[in-house]
Amino acid sequence: MMVTLKRTTSQDSDFNYLVTLLNKDLAEADGEILHAFYKQFNHTDKYNHIIVAYSDEKPIGCGAIKPFDDNTVEIKRMFVLQDERGKSVATKLLDALENWAKELGYFYCVLETGKKQKAAISFYTSYGYQRIPNYGQYKNIENSLCFKHNIK
């Protein structure tokens, strides 16, 4: 399988299609009430650094970075279609997002995922992300786990 990556912005229709599927996936995993709470933190209309993964011109995954502080970006909206998981698509996306963050002069990436997202937790820790205290809007949210990675 040949995977190609495209840098884009939040106006990209393929990205918005994948985010719709991600939201559906999370609503099923977390339940509607918890998903509705998290939705307020996931407005994608201002994202300028998005990567969409394709297989044979079909969008199969996405991820974004947004500034967190002067040295750090936050990884947002990481998602790979169910049928494409286990094929290194997420690794390619995360590699590309971290490389883009480096190009922009950042030193660290942070991210949040839910406690029920076992595959995501396993993926991020195997990639080198380490647990940190929950930050910002996730500070007192029991379902959230936050991670950080040094990319320099």
Go through each PLM region and give its residues:
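Conserved GNAT acetyl-CoA-binding A-motif
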Residues: L94, A101-T113
